Amino acid sequence: MNRFFFYFIIFYLISFNLYSKDNLKFFNLGKENFKNKNFDKAKINFEKDIVRNTKNQESYLYLAKIHNIKKNNPEFEKNLNTVLLLDPKNEEALYLLIKKKIKDADYDIAKSKYDLFKKICSNMCLKKEEIKKLLKKNKS
């Protein structure tokens, strides 16, 4: 019985490891295609990654960037909101959403997201002034 249990655990660990590598495969392929500006292939790979790992916020962020490049605003915003649902303090997603809301003249949401961005920024703090100027310029 102990031997069966031991083999079962080994089999489980090996299959879990293979499954994890398969997940990373699609994400890494997506990043590579995105880097090479092959956005259609990148989109497919990120979508495949999301099917396997629904909580990978990076895949949603890359999808948002792809939809932004392709001027597909509803999908761009939907993917940004998904990133923020998974990680409300994701600076890049907040920054992109703030810029979109300013562009859409939705200043109340842009301001509330900017207030959150100011509190949590650690990597993109230099963008605070840019957003502040955009809010001031477009609101007046």
Describe the predicted segments one by one.
Residues 35-36, 69-70, 103, 134-140:
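Register position in tetratricopeptide repeats
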Residues 111-140:
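Terminal, low-structured helical/coil segments at or just beyond the last alpha-helical repeat
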